[in-house]
A protein has these predicted regions:
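Short N-proximal segments of mature Sec-exported proteins
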Residues: 1-65, 87
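Short, compact, well-ordered microdomains
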Residues: 64-94
Length: 94
């Protein structure tokens, strides 16, 4: 899903905000699992929790903070997964 598609869903659907919140949680969990699998396969880690919490309710704030922090970088057609993965590597660096 792109940033534009997510914004449209959030505004047009009755439960759009709820749908996007759940979507972001899934993207966040998927990004962490994909990262962990890559590390197990020998890739250099880029997301390190180091004992800090990463909970489902944090997905939305990670996403929106990353969009605000780099507003000039992300275009509407960029995937939400990219934004959230970049947020995770920024907030949980190694």
């Amino acid at each position: 899903m792109t940033i534009r598609e997510m914004r449209t869903l959030e505004k047009k659907e009755k439960l759009g905000s709820t749908y996007t919140d759940y979507y972001l949680v899934g993207v966040m969990e998927g990004a962490v699992e994909a990262h962990n699998q890559a590390v197990r396969s020998g890739a250099k880690p880029s997301i390190c929790l180091n004992g800090r919490k990463l909970e489902p309710h944090m997905a939305k704030s990670l996403y929106t903070t990353e969009l605000k922090r780099n507003a000039d970088v992300y275009e509407a057609d960029f995937p939400v997964q990219l934004v959230l993965t970049n947020a995770l590597t920024t907030v949980y660096p190694c």
